[in-house]
Design a protein with these regions (language model features):
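Replication-associated primase and helicase/ATPase modules
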Residues: 1-70, 91-92
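Conserved helicase ATPase motor motifs in RecA-like P-loop NTPase domains
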Residues: 74-80, 105, 181-211, 348, ...
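Conserved strand-helix element at the start of the C-terminal RecA-like helicase core
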Residues: 96-108, 203-207, 250-284
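Inter-Walker segment of RecA-like/P-loop motor cores
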Residues: 115-152, 306-309
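SF2 helicase catalytic motif II
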Residues: 151-198
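Interdomain hinge/linker at the junction between the two RecA-like core domains of SF2 helicases
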Residues: 205-260
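Long, low-complexity intrinsically disordered regions enriched in Ser/Thr/Pro/Gly
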Residues: 296, 367-513
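Conserved SF2 helicase motif VI
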Residues: 341-370
Length: 513
């Protein structure tokens, strides 16, 4: 494996179990005696009632009834053809209207392309007109649920790929003032559907129990686990050290950026920060390299839609030196191209372990060596100093906040309405799922690298450790490039047209909520 790695890049490569204590997860964690890590691990469990071990779901002989009242939970291995299998199954169920719900459009665009016209995107394809046609199947972000009525979901099939991300989005502040409406319509869609299909490579019992609570006890439930572990990657976790002193530099990524730019052959990069993606793009472009970058600023353009519809074909046609993917393309994106990239890199300094794990697997080719630079904790951490030893603490916080809000009201009618809202929340499955998901995310962000390594090892990947030296010149170039990008953004905002008061008020409401 070492012969395939970039030369003059790594000063040390050793198996993970031989890491010294500066790098290795502490003994009490790795031996399973750490209570917090045990709690975290238990929250990630998935309990199937059907277990298979097949390289591809399409060849598994999996024979499921797919009848009204059924709910299916699939935890497939990465690269086992779950989308192809799902589309084949949906074609057999032509008598039902179908809704594919997602968190972000990028995954939905790729799904639509694979269905060969069986689905349309609500925002892109005049959904407000087509929704009157019962034969039209929709793919939509959960944000767009507000454009539907509860009755629209009667007797339909609801498909939720990457269901864990969708559930997290339900409690996200980004839904703003629409949050309660989105949650209500999501609940109605799950309750009213004839069949519900949920899929996720990181699916947990928490999500399963939540959907069951919404669906009711009179339904049939099937939880399917594919134990096959394809695409075992050779992964090197990179740790930056000072060139002169040998001191470990915990959050220094200059050496990784320098190594990425030193390649003469194509490389694939994922990064959890859009700003890092754009910075790397500019630095590579200034050296004459051709770059494909997918992030929130580029995904709406037509080129990126072509990329999403068939990534391998687009890469073969455009022949980029670098492909850079941000979290916008980190979930569900399937890039099966083989023998094109010589290395894959991941720069993980934001988000939680689940999100980082998903991004690493976007490039399917197992022959490509992977290099991960991951900070010990996420740069975006909620440092509220509250006691969050377990998800129960977050639940207590939520209840206390609701109680405080109630006490601040003066009108008796308002108090009664809010009291009823509190009771409804505490009686709902949201009161359990929301604090659990929040606690898991917070824990992973505070122990990002350790959690990610444990997840990669559990998935069967070959994990090693490598040191890489820092580079002061590259660090300075990164700093200057980011400053230029920020200055351009500020100038663009300054020169933009004034926002109407109505839009500004709506934006403030969204941010506040």
């Amino acid at each position: 494996d070492c012969d395939e790695r970039p030369t003059n890049a790594l000063t040390k490569i050793v198996p993970y179990l031989e890491w010294d204590t500066d790098y290795q997860i502490t003994t009490d964690i790795s031996s399973g005696n750490n209570e917090k890590f045990n709690d975290w691990s238990s929250q990630k469990q998935f309990t199937p009632n059907i277990t298979i071990n097949q390289p591809y779901l399409t060849d598994s002989g999996l024979n499921l009834p797919m009848k009204e009242g059924d709910t299916y939970f699939f935890k497939p291995g990465l690269g086992t053809g779950k989308t192809t299998w799902l589309i084949d199954e949906l074609k057999k169920l032509h008598q039902y209207r179908k809704y594919a719900l997602g968190k972000i459009n990028n995954l939905l665009f790729q799904f639509i392309a694979k269905t060969d016209g069986d689905f349309c995107h609500y925002q892109e394809h005049d959904g407000y007109i087509l929704k009157k046609d019962d034969n039209t199947n929709f793919a939509l972000c959960i944000n767009s649920l507000i454009h539907f009525d509860s009755e629209d979901f009667d007797g339909s099939i609801i498909i939720i790929d990457e269901v864990m991300s969708v559930l997290k989005q339900l409690y996200s502040p980004f839904l703003g003032s629409r949050r309660n409406t989105v949650i209500r319509l999501f609940e109605e869609a799950i309750r009213r559907a004839a069949i519900v299909i949920c899929l996720d490579g990181t699916l947990t019992d928490n999500a399963v129990e939540f959907i069951k609570e919404l669906r009711g006890k009179d339904k049939n439930y099937y939880s399917v686990l594919n134990e096959h572990k394809p695409n075992r990657f050779n992964i090197t976790i990179l740790q930056t050290t000072d060139t002169n002193s040998g001191k470990i530099l915990m959050n220094e990524m200059s050496g990784v950026i320098k190594q990425i730019l030193s390649h003469d052959e194509p490389v694939f990069i994922t990064a959890t920060s859009q700003k890092n993606c754009e910075t790397l793009d500019r630095m590579a472009t200034s050296e004459g390299k051709k770059v494909i970058r997918l992030d929130s600023t580029t995904s709406p353009n037509e080129c990126m839609k072509r990329f999403l519809s068939n990534p391998s074909e687009y890469i073969e046609q455009e022949k980029p030196d670098l492909v850079i993917i941000s979290p916008s393309g980190g979930e569900g994106l399937d890039i099966p191209i083989k023998d094109y990239f010589v290395a894959g890199y991941h720069i993980g300094n934001c988000l939680n372990a689940d999100d980082n794990y998903q991004m690493i697997a976007r490039l399917r080719d197992p022959s490509v060596p992977r290099y991960l630079w991951v900070s010990h904790k996420s740069f975006i951490v909620d440092n509220d100093n509250k006691n969050t030893e377990s998800w129960h603490d977050l639940w207590l916080d939520k209840v206390a906040n609701l109680r405080d809000d109630l006490g601040a009201l003066s009108c008796e009618d308002a108090k009664e309405a809010y009291r009823e809202r509190i009771i409804n929340y505490l009686d709902s499955p949201h009161s359990t799922l929301e604090p659990k998901l929040n606690w898991i995310s917070k824990f992973e962000m505070n122990h990002l690298r350790d959690c990610l390594i444990l997840m990669l090892q559990k998935a069967g990947h070959n994990v090693k450790f490598g040191e890489i030296n820092n580079c002061k010149e590259t660090k300075q170039e990164i700093k200057e490039t980011k400053e230029t990008i920020i200055q351009e953004e500020v100038t663009g905002i300054f020169n933009s047209e004034d926002i109407p008061d109505t839009v500004g008020k709506r934006w403030r409401t969204t941010v506040r909520d």
